[in-house]
Amino acid sequence: MERIKELRNLMSQSRTREILTKTTVDHMAIIKKYTSGRQEKNPSLRMKWMMAMKYPITADKRITEMVPERNEQGQTLWSKMSDAGSDRVMVSPLAVTWWNRNGPVTNTVHYPKVYKTYFDKVERLKHGTFGPVHFRNQVKIRRRVDINPGHADLSAKEAQDVIMEVVFPNEVGARILTSESQLTITKEKKEELQDCKISPLMVAYMLERELVRKTRFLPVAGGTSSIYIEVLHLTQGTCWEQMYTPGGEVRNDDVDQSLIIAARNIVRRAAVSADPLASLLEMCHSTQIGGTRMVDILRQNPTEEQAVDICKAAMGLRISSSFSFGGFTFKRTSGSSIKREEEVLTGNLQTLKIRVHEGYEEFTMVGKRATAILRKATRRLVQLIVSGRDEQSIAEAIIVAMVFSQEDCMIKAVRGDLNFVNRANQRLNPMHQLLRHFQKDAKVLFQNWGIEHIDSVMGMVGVLPDMTPSTEMSMRGIRVSKMGVDEYSSTERVVVSIDRFLRVRDQRGNVLLSPEEVSETQGTERLTITYSSSMMWEINGPESVLVNTYQWIIRNWETVKIQWSHNPTMLYNKMEFEPFQSLVPKAIRGQYSGFVRTLFQQMRDVLGTFDTTQIIKLLPFAAAPPKQSRMQFSSLTVNVRGSGMRILVRGNSPVFNYNKTTKRLTILGKDAGTLIEDPDESTSGVESAVLRGFLILGKEDRRYGPALSINELSNLAKGEKANVLIGQGDVVLVMKRKRDSSILTDSQTATKRIRMAIN
């Protein structure tokens, strides 16, 4: 109070006023502080000060011709004094009002296109529904979130090139538009923005919003996709939340969601194949998500999820240096450790070999529904502070931390044998064995852990073995906190390596990820995922396997036909027939295979019994390891639609139906494509016509390489010899004639010669 009186006193003296208003500020440090850099140091003061001025705005000189000096009320709209330091005019805020009411009206067609992100947002909010407000403590944790709904996923550099090309096409400077998405967007935007009068700089800003993902590290409780983040200020306060359902989806969220589902499916499938890494790469390269190649999305999309990161690692991309265990992302915040193999005994006296981390370390653990801070020493949990949405989530985090601590009392709490296996029926490593065991039932673990008295600390409570909170006692070292633990904020990416079993390691050899860490949660993708790889056929069930197998044979018929004649074993071992085996009843697989292989051999031996439709129909059955038996079959059973259905060896059935007139094949009533039969099946002697210009020398001669199809013969040079596959699946050696004159006689002699060469 005294100070205020003193100030008032001072201000009443005219000398004080004069000093404060007239003296220049000439202390360099102060001038520097307020004038260096383009960043405004005190925005609210600046705003108040500007608005108190008569002419806070500057404008181009042309304004004087377009806006009158005074408005209807006689107020001055701009000053005759020009702005110090530039040749611009100083303008009153009233001029803006005048312009908005009386200024020229331009064509508005481009506004929705340029300001698309805003128009879309208005639509989403218009159709969204806001529910009731609930008052409760909000556990928010900072996460890196996408704050810009509806964007493409271009890198900053790619976007810059697109923007320059669209907005400033005549500017100098090399611009290379390479990716599919860059070219499509550029073409589309150039068409949309023809004759656009909106300032190019504004257009460039708005384009950037549409093309680039912008992320911020924000405190969030609840939905993290961009359509929830855009209304964060409406849905989450410090002590309240408002329910909200967005009024529309945006492609970038759909891509993120579908990418995670595709990656999980692919990693799960690859893990059970003979060569997981090769299979994973094959699937990533042959999969499309919403019409875009998955590998292109992986290169651009920063989503961090276990399966997605495994796919990125396989492609040689950098990923985050944090590691995953039990569905939690661990990031070491301090300390260090060395690893040493150690043998330990479980409560069931089973020996486990574990890699012990020796040394003191601190970690943050971030999961979907719980977060924690973990401090541990060698095989000892020092402290765990955990927070989560509910009791279940908190328990999950505690189990993971207890197992991760490698404490002896945890290992001794194992009851029964540990023999968990992964999808490929291989035993899990010891740490995951322990994790699975306690995730199933943690009662003994919590009971054996030990209890301690606790001091009361603000915002923290103890937790008892039955997961009830307590202010007096708690499981040793474990506390539940009201505050969440922030996600790791850095976007740093590190180089990693991946082995053929999909274990991802950093450069020090620490395992960051493995297929065991991939979530088993099933979801429905929002964008269409097209898996072209045969490994993924089974994802849509038995019918899809059946249709896809036959479609594959038809698409590749030319090469399949040659292999069928010459290298059947290689053909039977093709991975494309693998999924089909799961449809054939196990007990009879081998006999079917033996029967079909014998039948095929007879076709090869006996002239003129080559039957395209029958070969295609029975081929997948020959892929199983054959059992020799005398059994003959008139039909073969496949398990689809929940029961056994029959494929007739000779003739059509609902499963496999070939219409000779239309040449269409239908599988289970679904169109499977057109099947062109071999010409010789209907007309004999065609091969002689095809072989005009060639001399048939005799039986196949292996020295001249694999058999060519008749279509490939045209590439031969005159006098060159080659094996060629003719109608019935037989192979003969031919030579391209040196002279054209004798071509006519070829067709007569060819037929005789073929018969002789074969027999």
From Swiss-Prot:
Annotated site (Mammalian adaptation): 627
Alphabetical list of Gene3D superfamilies matching this protein: Polymerase Basic Protein 2, C-terminal domain
The entry's keywords: Cap snatching, Eukaryotic host gene expression shutoff by virus, Eukaryotic host transcription shutoff by virus, Host gene expression shutoff by virus, Host mitochondrion, Host nucleus, Host-virus interaction, Inhibition of host innate immune response by virus, Inhibition of host MAVS by virus, Inhibition of host RLR pathway by virus, Inhibition of host RNA polymerase II by virus, mRNA capping, mRNA processing, Viral immunoevasion, Viral transcription, Virion
Gene Ontology CC terms, in alphabetical order: host cell mitochondrion; host cell nucleus; virion component
Swiss-Prot/TrEMBL GO biological process terms: 7-methylguanosine mRNA capping; cap snatching; DNA-templated transcription; symbiont-mediated suppression of host cytoplasmic pattern recognition receptor signaling pathway via inhibition of MAVS activity; symbiont-mediated suppression of host gene expression; symbiont-mediated suppression of host mRNA transcription via inhibition of RNA polymerase II activity; viral RNA genome replication
InterPro entries xref list: Flu_PB2_2nd (IPR049110), Flu_PB2_6th (IPR049114), Flu_PB2_C (IPR049115), Flu_PB2_CAP-bd (IPR048298), Flu_PB2_middle (IPR049111), Flu_PB2_N (IPR049106), INV_PB2 (IPR001591), PB2_helical (IPR049113)
Residue ranges that the Swiss-Prot or TrEMBL entry lists as coiled coil: none
UniProt GO MF annotations: RNA binding; RNA-directed RNA polymerase activity
Location, primary (coarse class): virion
Motif Nuclear localization signal boundaries: 736-739
Compartment(s): Virion; Host nucleus; Host mitochondrion
Keyword Zinc-finger: no
Record function comment: Plays an essential role in transcription initiation and cap-stealing mechanism, in which cellular capped pre-mRNAs are used to generate primers for viral transcription. Recognizes and binds the 7-methylguanosine-containing cap of the target pre-RNA which is subsequently cleaved after 10-13 nucleotides by the viral protein PA. Plays a role in the initiation of the viral genome replication and modulates the activity of the ribonucleoprotein (RNP) complex.
Protein family (similarity comment): Belongs to the influenza viruses PB2 family.
HAMAP family xref list: INV_PB2
Complex and partners: Influenza RNA polymerase is composed of three subunits: PB1, PB2 and PA. Interacts (via N-terminus) with PB1 (via C-terminus). Interacts with nucleoprotein NP (via N-terminus). Interacts (via N-terminus) with host MAVS (via N-terminus); this interaction inhibits host innate immune response.
Name of protein: Polymerase basic protein 2
Organism (species): Influenza A virus (strain A/Hong Kong/5/1983 H3N2)
